[in-house]
Design a protein with these regions (language model features):
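Extracytoplasmic small-molecule ligand-binding "clamshell" domains
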Residues: 30-100, 107, 167-170
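Periplasmic-binding protein-like
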Residues: 45-46, 118-126, 200-244
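Ligand-binding cleft/hinge of the Venus flytrap
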Residues: 60-72, 114, 137-139, 150-172, ...
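Short, hydrophobic alpha-helical packing/hinge segments within bilobed ligand-binding/sensory domains
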Residues: 83-88, 175-179, 185, 195
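A ligand-binding cleft/hinge motif common to bilobed small-molecule-binding domains
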Residues: 86, 99-108, 156-159, 186-220
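Flexible hinge/capping segments at coil-to-helix
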Residues: 126-145
Length: 250
């Protein structure tokens, strides 16, 4: 009986040891392996956003929280928005965090879209004093509407604007806002932002008026994602797990 009892204890201990080895092995296998070990290289469109209404600030804070949880150092790379989603597929960055919508024509081999972390609806920004003059894009015939090159807003305006609407294209929102502030633009095509639960994310104060709210594709959410480099092992699953447990914005 003593020998049987001893043998049973040995077998039980071996089983526990094997389980621990398997768990440790899985943990090692699931470690994030970035393009540069320990460094998360992230593409953004703004170097140091400070405005509480700036989506790039929300995204930056979100990525910083992710990196802190996984003990990664961040290397920020400031890029133009247009075609920024290609950087991950070219192995230039681990993560594209430029607020990319998951349009099929932005998907490329070598990178994968994350789960969505917010969604948007299209709108037009106007001056408060013009609120009685404008309601819909068709009211801007003979007027100038600004868009950022490559963004969903550009697609939307090009599709919806009737003949006679002047479309001004720039590379950045900063340039658009500067022109808007000095009266060179009558409206800016941009977005209203929403958390996944449908709550509006405040993106402007009372001095800003957004009109003509609509879905880019009627009845379909325009979802924003991160673009993750496929060579950055286990990064996609970690990002998706983080999105699942962490509400955006923080």
């Amino acid at each position: 009986m003593n020998r049987l009892g001893t043998l049973s204890r040995v077998i039980a201990r071996l089983a526990i040891l094997c389980t621990l080895i398997a768990v440790i092995g899985c943990a090692v296998d699931q470690q994030i392996q970035t393009l540069r070990p320990g460094v998360l290289t992230v593409a953004v469109t703004s170097g140091a956003p400070t405005n509480q209404y700036d989506p790039q600030l929300w995204i930056r804070q979100y990525v910083e929280q992710f990196a802190a949880e996984y003990e990664l150092t961040i290397s920020w790379v400031v890029v133009p928005f247009n075609e920024s989603w290609l950087l991950a597929s070219r192995d230039e960055v681990d993560l594209v965090a430029t607020n990319v919508a998951n349009f099929p024509d932005r998907a490329h081999s070598g990178a994968t879209f994350s789960a969505p972390f917010l969604y948007e609806r299209r709108a037009l920004r106007i001056n408060p004093e013009d609120q009685e003059r404008y309601e819909h894009i068709s009211d801007f015939i003979g007027k100038t509407v600004g868009v950022v090159s490559g963004m969903a807003a550009e697609r939307d305006v090009n599709r919806r604007a009737p003949d006679g609407v002047i479309v001004r294209t720039t590379d950045t929102f900063a340039q658009l806002y500067a022109e808007f502030d000095v009266g060179q633009l009558d409206a800016i095509a941009e977005a209203e932002y929403y958390a996944l639960d449908g709550q509006v994310i405040p993106s402007h104060g009372s001095e800003v008026i957004l009109i003509d709210h609509h879905d880019l594709t009627p009845g379909q959410r325009e979802e924003s994602v991160f673009v993750v480099c496929d060579k950055s092992q286990n990064l996609l699953s970690a990002v998706n797990a983080f999105i699942a447990r962490t509400r955006f914005p923080l």
